[in-house]
Amino acid sequence: MPMSKSFLKKALLGGAVAAGAAVWAIAPRSFSDKRRNYVPAVPDVWYAHRGLHDAGSGLTAQYANESGEYVALARRMAMKAGYGSPDTPGVIAPENSLAAFAAACEAGYGIELDLQMTRDGEVVVVHDGDLMRVAGDPRRIADLTYDELTRIPLFPTDAPGACKAAPLPLALEEPPLVTTPDNAPEGYYQHVPLFADVLKVVAGRVPLIVEYKFDDNSKWDPRDVELMEKGDALLQAYSGKYVIESFNPAAVNWYKENRPEVCRGQLSWWPSGKGKTADPVALGKEYAAGALVFDWISRPDFVAYDWHGGNSPQVRLARFMGAVPVSWTVRSRDEYAQCSDQFDRHIFEAFVPDEQ
């Protein structure tokens, strides 16, 4: 049966409305708003993911062909900056450590890093909600004071190039029985640093991408606001170049409402593989976030997206409307070749980019 003109008209109208709604939802900050607030662009450099590190994220067997050169560079640059020595037997510059950030500065790379808050309200730089992967300690950052963190070495018994720390004694008990030592361990080690100390080390030498981390990106509570306020206060007193980003649209919106002059970015990815949640409600929210339909909340200046999704309709549309696409996390020359024309900036680890 042929379609009636009335049905076709309604279908076309519905499609136009849906397309218009998608464009409205995904649209970044307007050019006039950028001009009015003198918003800087995302500096055009390579960004070292969690610093230039010799242990931690991305250093898996999958990338072993190129990661050796990367680890060697991280150690060389860290030692040049005064961290460790050729005689240091273990890890010198673990991810998100002062040594890793100093190494990135020495190599001339920008830095991507992560902010969380300790039990006593200190803003620290660490990615995961707990210390298991980076210190073999299952305790959560939110349950530890900064003083305790200074006595917990990152990758304490691991060799350079390790992607995960070996579990501490009693870490795998149920419940875990790990406790913080009364005194700092002897010898060289790195621990979770204060954000204030990271800013002192970087001292404006390279630009920063600062990510605000939260346990649940679909919620917003007073402790989350406290992290925003304290992190921003440190950045307001900092004279170097930086931009901010978060998976949580409410965090990016906080900057929209309170610091419109700061370049802000929405982090996202298309849920897939092992990282995909089994909760159908949460998964629906993740798919919506991956489609960038919450960008109307934050109106970002850039979209930091999993590099696999650079050719997706939502990223291409955001780029067309003026958002700067930033890839994460590129871990080989082959991955860079696959996504280089889809993104304008790149966050990398586990290989040394040819373009420096």
Q: Where is each model-derived feature located?
A:
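Phosphate-group recognition and catalysis centered on beta-loop-alpha active-site segments
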Residues: 2-356
